């Protein structure tokens, strides 16, 4: 059945919103997916994420094929051409269909006079593809990262930077966290097998399962009933390290969208959890996740730098601080990060992290535990941040810290520090 929309033009609009307006893909896509079929939702996501993942390559190709870049009101067609090139390079969409749908995207974008240009560029690429791809392998853009970020990663990991870049450029695996209140991991693996969904357990994380192929969450047994949550295995380590106990007072700071909040309560259902986040809109996601899993926490809006505004004289047994960060460890999940972040952001984020750490420390009980976590791979936000904190706090002792790096079949890039109050 013929659809009333052109998916390639929708993808071009999404990419324009990211690159020209600085919006995140995760904020843009849900609205654009509202009136399209489930099958096309998945393809739209593939086109948007894939185009942004390979952006430098697509830009380079266009530079080779066009004398002048499209600018101003025609800029949207530059992104449409990118979508077309991505399809030809990386998807199973038949070339003739990719070509036709991309060219028709010009009509949907009210630029029918440029159909011929788009058709010409894409056909020229088809003719020159092998030669262009061979040349690209010697180009500086081949790492698909902005130069400032590439430099930072090289400096931080002189022996490992290439494997990190490779990990960042992969499509991410889909990890699940089994809700131990309902099922053991082995029981849930059996449920997946019954549904024909191939999956693997993880020796290092007791409730983690990796799917062989990502799927729609509504195909997962008992998803709506709260039997399982989508959460990367590295993120699952946060609540595991925190080791919450029933009846304890626990603060989950920077809690949205609630994956760690709910994990804490799955481990310790009778814990008293206060979930705080500065973003009221994202707090709605925390409440949704709590409701789906039938768990209870107190959810409040608040700035981690000013705890006196939202927790009065409370004292906590354990605090989980998933600090605001560059998110350089989750680029494979959010490739737009590469183009939304700027070099100067890192120092600003490190300052915010420092302020939150110092502000929240007095609210941790003596003998209590704080887990500091980020989804960053940059030392300024991680090991260096913790070293500076420990040197300024005589009653703080770090018993464990670890940096995970993004790997193809493993977890996201993540940092953890387990700090005890003497």
UniProtKB/Swiss-Prot annotation:
E.C. code: 2.1.1.176
SUPFAM superfamilies attached to this UniProt entry: NusB-like, S-adenosyl-L-methionine-dependent methyltransferases
Keyword flag Cell inner membrane: no
Keywords, alphabetical: Cytoplasm, Methyltransferase, RNA-binding, rRNA processing, S-adenosyl-L-methionine, Transferase
Database matches in CDD domains: AdoMet_MTases, Methyltransferase_Sun
UniProt cross-references to PROSITE patterns, sorted A to Z: NOL1_NOP2_SUN (PS01153), SAM_MT_RSMB_NOP (PS51686)
Reactions the enzyme catalyzes: cytidine(967) in 16S rRNA + S-adenosyl-L-methionine = 5-methylcytidine(967) in 16S rRNA + S-adenosyl-L-homocysteine + H(+)
Residues annotated for S-adenosyl-L-methionine binding in this entry: 254-260, 277, 303, 322
Record bears the keyword Cytoplasm: yes
Compartment list: Cytoplasm
Cited function: Specifically methylates the cytosine at position 967 (m5C967) of 16S rRNA.
PANTHER family: NOL1_NOP2_SUN FAMILY PROTEIN _ ANTITERMINATION NUSB DOMAIN-CONTAINING PROTEIN, NOP2 YEAST -RELATED NOL1/NOP2/FMU SUN DOMAIN-CONTAINING
Protein family membership: Belongs to the class I-like SAM-binding methyltransferase superfamily. RsmB/NOP family.
Protein name per its UniProtKB record: Ribosomal RNA small subunit methyltransferase B
Species per Swiss-Prot/TrEMBL record: Proteus mirabilis (strain HI4320)
